Amino acid sequence: HACVKNGERLAKMAVEETGFGRWQDKVLKNKLGSELTWNFIKDMKTVGCLSEDKTKKVWEIGVPMGVIAALIPSTNPTSTVMYKTMISLKSGNAIIISPHPGAKKCITETYEVIKEAAELAGAPKGAIGCVTLITPEATDALLKHPDVSLILATGGEAMVHAAYSSGNPALGVGPGNGPSYIENSADIPMAVKRIVDSKTFDNGTICAPEQSIVTEYGISPQVEEELK
């Protein structure tokens, strides 16, 4: 609720500080990263015996990792803090936010909003932390710290590579080259609209939109016409 309540203010802060995106789209991203994420995960069991196959004598056991280091990008700063904090706490872990230097104000403010709300709801003090010394050396020290159990790295190729090379377990996310395929029977105007909407959302700052279009033979002229 705190994230949604402050969603517009934080979205405007992010655009003003970074110069990336549209604040209206970032409001939606903040809602996706907080309220909708929470509604999806709130009833999930994440710790203890998650499933049991008595026939095969296989049990799936969920165990918290410990301390998670979360690298936050400048393109999606506030929503990424919300999402990573929520999934970390839900799975029984503590989290340390590492802000991008180009978005430190809005990231730190989002951290403060979440920290206050989480502690009011009963989260242990210190379960959510944020790096205040924002330098490459500080980030490197965090990534390589022996007490860090997992790194969640969102950002450019160099940063994700640094996380993978740190010696600690890491999950990295960055820009990809995702093609979309339009088949002959597709509703071409609708397909093109969806692709353009995806690509232009938040002025194209999302890592996951379509980067290219592959069409089935014979419909490329129609697709090109719709794109004009």
Language model features with spans:
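A structured beta-alpha segment of the ubiquitous adenosine-cofactor-binding alpha/beta core
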Residues: 47-60, 129-148
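N-terminal Rossmann-like NAD(P)+-binding subdomain of aldehyde/semialdehyde dehydrogenases
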Residues: 1-57
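Short acidic loop-to-helix transition motifs that present clustered carboxylates
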Residues: 133-137, 157-159, 177
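Glycine- and Gly-Pro-enriched alpha-helical subdomains that act as flexible
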Residues: 108-109, 120, 134, 138, ...
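Conserved small-residue-rich beta-alpha loop and adjacent elements
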Residues: 42-117, 121, 166-170, 177-178, ...
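ALDH superfamily catalytic-core signature
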Residues: 90, 160-228
